[in-house]
């Protein structure tokens, strides 16, 4: 249960009970009242700005109104004390019995604790990675892959019906270049000396194997075909090979999409999907024939000093109108974006999230314009931009050669440090801030390495369970037994740990609402820190040890507390896509 939602309801009921009205006699708007943890934990457990928010409408001084509300809140059986602070904040401190009851709820819910109905089954499409199928995934793709995947997992846990989607950019000019590059490697595999890879083609050695496979399958047949026919075959085989490599890279990172959508699907049957999308916009009055003035600076590829078919995107929030069809009748890349959005919308998605690299910042307004025009303002579109990842080793930048074809791949990073450190650390800064990734730091066994610190807390929980088996003979811990003596948990440090656990449902909902999965990584680190601190208190003070052989009831209660810590760590790490280890060496 979200205790802050619980007290939000209680506070609003209290406001109704004291018959609080607007000074003109009307009903008060209580929807904007905030109920949250105080910034300083010493101030209490629950804070609300109700008095400050309502004082003007009520016509009463904020502190006087706060005192009136506080007096009424003292009647709540779970409230130990109520204080008014500053200009009119109301801080509530709750009784230990309330936290003990909440801990029992958490224990009974297990790893489902924190799961929310916030999304109410609403369909959400999360598109992420969508790397061009022209080579292996590089480290620059890694952050977007993790942010998108964890956000999708988070939204599912918050009750949304989520589809994870990958858009395969397999219809552009870069695919033609790729096919010609592989054709060269095919000829090389047949024994021809190809010399230096010509400028403009893909030089990567990863294409050698594709050429060899084509030589093994076709022999010299491709050389005997008309070039266009041979290139069509090479293109199909190469896209399949590249996507197999990309899927394998993503699998190594524990990223699994539900849908792989091919751009070429939009171009079948004379680009019927694109034509239909443009016709739909035309019927709505969003398309016209015209000429665009030349943009300042470098000219984009789709600008022509001729009449084109244009999208009135400025009428729906964009900076300039966008070309859909060139003067020669060919479609722009943007026209494909319109058709792809329409396809998603027609599949029943009213909410779509695009996770893109920071270099796609210029796409945001045009995509938002497409969403407004195609859906008549009914669809919600969000674009999350992921800033660059800078690689370090022992604090020194990792240099990547500028020579063509040389870069650090996603697989290189995962193979060196492991999947879990990569996933966790890619979340350890907000997506729109640059991130430093140090190979040495993420494998360090210290508090300064967040993923180690969190996973070590999980392992420590299980070491407590093993100690319980050795010292108390409790091999199979029973949740009913563990939850039957929570009234024995009275030490302030234990109650503080319960408070931290109780934040989890609110954290899940706020991270989902704001689409900020990094909040989960921060919370897990804070929870791990609280648990390690409690462990250390037991080391310093025998009375606070999790297991007291001479007091089995207290031991069971503390084991129940450890079990809930383990459950929340497991839940959060599962959403992140990392393991919750039972032991670490």
UniProtKB/Swiss-Prot annotation:
One of its GO terms (biological process) is arginyl-tRNA aminoacylation. Its main location: cytoplasm. A motif ('HIGH' region) lies at residues 131-141. It catalyses: tRNA(Arg) + L-arginine + ATP = L-arginyl-tRNA(Arg) + AMP + diphosphate. Signal peptide: none annotated. It is an enzyme of class 6 (ligase). It is found in: Cytoplasm. The keyword Cytoplasm applies. GO terms for molecular function: arginine-tRNA ligase activity; ATP binding. InterPro entries: aa-tRNA-synth_I_CS, Arg-tRNA-ligase, Arg-tRNA-synth_N, Arg-tRNA-synth_N_sf, ArgRS_core, DALR_anticod-bd, Rossmann-like_a/b/a_fold, tRNAsynth_Ia_anticodon-bd. GO terms for cellular component: cytoplasm. Its EC number is 6.1.1.19. It comes from the Bacteria. Belongs to the class-I aminoacyl-tRNA synthetase family. Monomer. This is Arginine--tRNA ligase. The gene is argS.
């Amino acid at each position: 249960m979200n205790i802050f939602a619980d007290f939000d309801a209680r506070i609003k009921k209290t406001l109704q009970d004291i018959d609080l009205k607007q000074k003109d006699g009307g009903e008060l708007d209580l929807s904007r009242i905030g109920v949250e943890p105080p910034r300083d934990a010493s101030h209490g457990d629950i804070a609300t700005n109700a008095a400050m928010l309502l004082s003007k409408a009520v016509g009463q001084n904020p502190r006087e109104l706060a005192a009136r509300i506080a007096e009424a809140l003292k009647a709540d059986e779970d409230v130990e004390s109520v204080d008014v602070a500053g200009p009119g904040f109301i801080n509530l401190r709750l009784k230990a019995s309330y936290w003990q009851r909440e801990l029992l709820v958490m224990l009974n819910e297990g790893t489902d604790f924190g799961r929310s109905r916030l999304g109410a089954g609403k369909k959400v499409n999360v598109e992420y990675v969508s790397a061009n199928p022209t080579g292996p995934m590089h480290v620059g793709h890694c952050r977007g892959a993790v942010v998108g995947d964890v956000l999708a997992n988070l939204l599912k846990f918050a009750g949304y019906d989520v589809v994870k989607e990958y858009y395969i950019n397999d219809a552009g000019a870069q695919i033609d270049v790729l096919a010609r590059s592989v054709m060269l490697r095919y000829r090389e595999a047949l024994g021809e000396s190809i010399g230096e890879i010509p400028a403009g083609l893909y030089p990567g050695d990863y294409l050698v194997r594709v050429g060899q496979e084509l030589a093994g399958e076709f022999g010299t047949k491709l050389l005997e075909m008309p070039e266009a026919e041979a290139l069509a075959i090479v293109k199909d085989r190469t896209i399949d090979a590249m996507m197999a490599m990309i899927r394998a890279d993503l699998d190594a990172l524990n990223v699994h999409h539900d849908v792989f959508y091919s751009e070429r699907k939009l171009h079948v049957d004379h680009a019927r999907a694109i034509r239909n999308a443009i016709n739909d916009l035309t019927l709505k009055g969003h398309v016209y024939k015209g000429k665009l003035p030349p943009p300042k600076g470098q000219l984009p590829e789709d600008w022509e000093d001729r009449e084109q078919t244009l999208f009135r995107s400025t009428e729906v929030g964009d900076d300039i109108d966008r070309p859909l069809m060139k003067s020669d009748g060919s479609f722009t890349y943007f026209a494909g974006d319109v058709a792809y959005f329409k396809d998603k919308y027609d599949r029943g998605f009213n909410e779509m999230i695009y996770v893109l690299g920071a270099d796609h910042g210029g796409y945001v307004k045009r995509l938002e314009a497409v969403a407004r025009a195609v859906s008549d303002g009914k669809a919600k579109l969000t674009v999350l931009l992921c800033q660059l990842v800078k690689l370090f080793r022992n604090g020194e930048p990792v240099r990547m050669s500028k020579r063509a074809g040389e870069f650090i791949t996603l697989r290189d990073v995962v193979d060196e440090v492991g999947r879990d450190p990569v996933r966790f650390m890619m979340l350890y800064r907000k997506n729109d801030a640059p991130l430093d990734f140090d190979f040495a730091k993420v494998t360090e066994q210290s508090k300064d390495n967040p993923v180690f610190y969190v996973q070590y807390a999980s392992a420590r929980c299980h070491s407590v369970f093993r100690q319980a088996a050795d010292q108390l003979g409790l091999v199979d811990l029973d949740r009913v037994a563990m939850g039957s003596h929570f009234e024995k948990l009275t030490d302030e440090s234990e109650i503080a740990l319960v408070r931290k656990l109780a934040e989890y449902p609110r954290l899940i909902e706020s991270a989902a609402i704001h689409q900020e999965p990094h909040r989960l990584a921060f919370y897990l680190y804070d929870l791990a820190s609280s648990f390690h601190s409690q462990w250390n208190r037991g080391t310093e003070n025998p009375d606070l040890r999790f297991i007291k052989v001479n007091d089995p009831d207290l031991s069971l209660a503390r084991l129940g507390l450890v079990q809930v810590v383990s459950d929340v760590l497991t839940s959060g790490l599962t959403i992140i896509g990392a393991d919750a280890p039972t032991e670490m060496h």
